[in-house]
Swiss-Prot record:
Keyword Magnesium: no
GO cellular component: a single term: small ribosomal subunit
CDD domains for the chain: S4
The protein, known as: Small ribosomal subunit protein uS4
InterPro entries: Ribosomal_uS4, Ribosomal_uS4_bac-type, Ribosomal_uS4_N, S4_RNA-bd, S4_RNA-bd_sf
Key words of the record: Ribonucleoprotein, Ribosomal protein, RNA-binding, rRNA-binding
Assembly information from the UniProt record: Part of the 30S ribosomal subunit. Contacts protein S5. The interaction surface between S4 and S5 is involved in control of translational fidelity.
Record function comment: One of the primary rRNA binding proteins, it binds directly to 16S rRNA where it nucleates assembly of the body of the 30S subunit.
PANTHER family in alphabetical order: 30S 40S RIBOSOMAL PROTEIN (PTHR11831), SMALL RIBOSOMAL SUBUNIT PROTEIN US4M (PTHR11831:SF4)
Family (UniProt): Belongs to the universal ribosomal protein uS4 family.
UniProt GO BP: ribosomal small subunit biogenesis; translation
GO MF term set: rRNA binding; structural constituent of ribosome
Length: 209
């Protein structure tokens, strides 16, 4: 399965909800989902009663699309979550939240996760002072994430910071925009992820069948 490079708004319509894949645009009047909040295609307006399996599948697909993760990697995250002690749901959420591209987005250095992935892939991001260009890199509590000094004048980064200055960031993070750096303080708790419109328990049930 290749990474989806098509129109992001179609993914929101397919899932029947806003996935906020385009960042600030999703909150504006220009958001296409507000005009056509139904699935694309000839039968997109038809409402179907979904089976339990279908609901579980949709939950999994939705979470994968929000974080931009492919099936093989997502299953690995689930298998790790099961092996860890504690709540499997919370462990699974922590696996995707610890992705470097997600942390860069959460810190406000990019307007969305796709843009954050590009920043990481192009070598603009440092972890504990060393360049890491792997978007799926797992950040650990205490890690310092920063923008490389030579990349701090890049317009998309400056725009993202200007947009996010003054906004509250996630409780498990700390950020200093003047220094272009932030800290991944701890793993988040499930109830703290307020922008994840997914029944994570349904995903656990899907994989545990």
């Amino acid at each position: 399965m290749a990474r989806n490079t098509g129109p992001l708004c179609k993914l929101c319509r397919r899932e029947g909800m806003k996935l906020y894949l385009k960042g600030e645009r999703c909150f504006s009047e220009k958001c296409p989902f507000d005009k056509r909040p139904f699935a694309p295609g000839q039968h997109g307006r038809e409402k179907k009663k979904l089976t339990q399996y279908a609901l579980q599948l949709r939950a999994k697909q939705t979470m994968k699309r929000i974080y931009g993760v492919l099936e093989k990697q997502f299953r690995i995250y689930y298998e790790r979550a099961v092996k860890q002690s504690g709540d499997t749901r919370e462990n699974l959420v922590a696996q995707v939240e610890r992705r470097l591209d997600n942390v860069v987005y959460r810190l406000g250095f990019a307007i969305n996760r796709r843009a954050a992935r590009q920043l990481v892939s192009h070598g603009h991001v440092l972890v504990n002072g060393k360049k890491v260009d792997i978007p799926s890199y797992q950040v650990r509590p205490g890690d310092v994430i920063s923008i490389k000094e030579g990349s701090r004048t890049i317009e998309p980064i400056k725009q993202a910071i200007e947009l996010n200055k003054g906004r509250a960031i996630s409780n498990w993070l700390e950020v200093d925009y003047d220094q272009f750096k932030g800290v991944y303080v701890r793993n988040p708790k499930l109830e703290e992820i307020i922008d994840l419109p997914v029944n994570v328990q349904a995903i656990v049930e899907f994989y545990s069948r």
